[in-house]
Amino acid sequence: MSEPADIAAMTFEQALAELEQIVARLESGQAPLEDSIRMYERGAALKAHCETRLEAARLRVEKIVMGAGGAPASEPAEFG
């Protein structure tokens, strides 16, 4: 299942901010059931988008190392 086009166009920061708003509204318990379900579904899509963006950023990060002969080189950074 692909995410809605408006979510796909969001930056990580935009998606995270909206996700935080949704969480706050859901935690308040004030929304009707159907609205809560819609918010939950959108929140799940936003969460997936944020995870995808974070993974893409992680893959782009490289560690600069001294290669053979003292020349600088880069290699994928290790996380975890």
Curated annotation (Swiss-Prot):
Q: From the UniProt record, which GO molecular function terms apply?
A: exodeoxyribonuclease VII activity
**Which reaction equations make up its catalytic activity?**
Exonucleolytic cleavage in either 5'- to 3'- or 3'- to 5'-direction to yield nucleoside 5'-phosphates
**InterPro entries per the UniProt record, alphabetical:** Exonuc_VII_S, Exonuc_VII_ssu_sf
Q: Which domain of life is it from?
A: Bacteria
Q: What is its EC number?
A: 3.1.11.6
Tell me what gene encodes this: xseB
Name the keywords, alphabetized: Cytoplasm, Exonuclease, Hydrolase, Nuclease
Q: What is the name listed in the Swiss-Prot or TrEMBL entry for this protein?
A: Exodeoxyribonuclease 7 small subunit
Entry's Gene Ontology cellular component terms: cytosol; exodeoxyribonuclease VII complex
One Gene Ontology BP term is: DNA catabolic process
The entry assigns this protein to a family as follows: Belongs to the XseB family.
Q: Where in the cell is it found?
A: Cytoplasm
Subunit composition? Heterooligomer composed of large and small subunits.
Recorded hits in NCBIfam families, A to Z, give: PRK00977.1-3 (NF002139), xseB (TIGR01280)
Q: What class of enzyme is it?
A: hydrolase
Pfam families for the chain: Exonuc_VII_S
Function, as annotated? Bidirectionally degrades single-stranded DNA into large acid-insoluble oligonucleotides, which are then degraded further into small acid-soluble oligonucleotides.
